[in-house]
Amino acid sequence: MNYSIRLFKIMGIPIELHITFILFLVVIIGLSIMNNSIFWAVLFILLFVSVVLHELGHSYVAKKYGVKIEKILLLPIGGVAMMDKIPKEGELRIGIAGPLVSFIIGIVLLIVSQFFDININGYPLLYTLSLLNLMLGGFNLIPAFPMDGGRILRAILSKKYGYLKSTKIAANIGKSLALIMLLFGLLSMNIILILVSLFVYFGAEQESRVVEVETIFKNIKAKDIMTPNPVYVTPDMSIEEFLDFMLKHKYFGYPVVENGKLVGCIGIGNIHKKEGTVRDYMEKPVVVSEDTDIKEILRKMANTDRVFVVEGGKLKGIISKTDILRAMSILELKEELKD
């Protein structure tokens, strides 16, 4: 289900409003009407126009590096330019572009407001908007993920410490900052600050994990991490025989092979009765080839505990979540020792 509404396109990039943004806007407008003041509603709308321009700054430079921009999504807590993986060589310039746009808007509005301003309900609109843009640019330059400053910091540090270690440094700063924000948010009962702190924390955590997986599993294929020549069961094996087989080999899931070909898979969670055979309970296996990369393997494992490696119609190996974690631990240690 799509939870966003497309407004228009700029530079070929769709601008979309998330449904929560619309609900938040309705609340802001409602409160403005109740208080006989439209200032905050107008300011809110103009601020998010500024956010769109901020994200377009990132997107414009990113497109120069051949990055595909899916869309810019507006949320109550800000905007997100959803794009393909940013190339390492362009991360510094792409990261700086957004805050630079915000600073330019802020400085221009600040200068203009000294000669001309729009007063609504006694509040100076342009002056207030200029300060918010300067704050937006400054906040995004905080050297912590998922803010732009985190990407800028990583781009600078990666020249000395490597991409993975630099990501972890920026992510840890981001999570530490998020915990401080959460503490202040809870003490002051500030819902917005609490939501922003959660966004920052999980954004930093996600960035760290994604980069860690991409870095340590670079050039790793299914054949490199699979358990080769796995034990298997046959479709005609009784459930009682299967349970004894499972007790002997200590695994929770097994491939089902008939006449040398993989025909299914079965695990402890598939068994509900003692009657019948393996054929009655087996499921369709999720299959990959020996050269399948880790990204595709993880995508296929989203709804299953294991995938089976098949080449030329023959079962070559099995990859379980335990295999993934084991390989990750070993490869992560190799990466750390390399640095």
Swiss-Prot record:
Cell compartment(s), UniProt: Cell membrane
Keywords: CBS domain, Cell membrane, Hydrolase, Membrane, Metal-binding, Metalloprotease, Protease, Repeat, Transmembrane, Transmembrane helix, Zinc
Protein name as it appears in the record: Zinc metalloprotease MJ0392
Species annotation: Methanocaldococcus jannaschii (strain ATCC 43067 / DSM 2661 / JAL-1 / JCM 10045 / NBRC 100440) (Methanococcus jannaschii)
Membrane topology, as annotated: Multi-pass membrane protein
Enzyme active site: E55
Phylogenetic placement of the source organism: Archaea, Methanobacteriati, Methanobacteriota, Methanomada group, Methanococci
Keyword Chloroplast assigned: no
Cofactor: Zn(2+)
Enzyme Commission number(s) of this protein: 3.4.24.-
Enzyme class: hydrolase
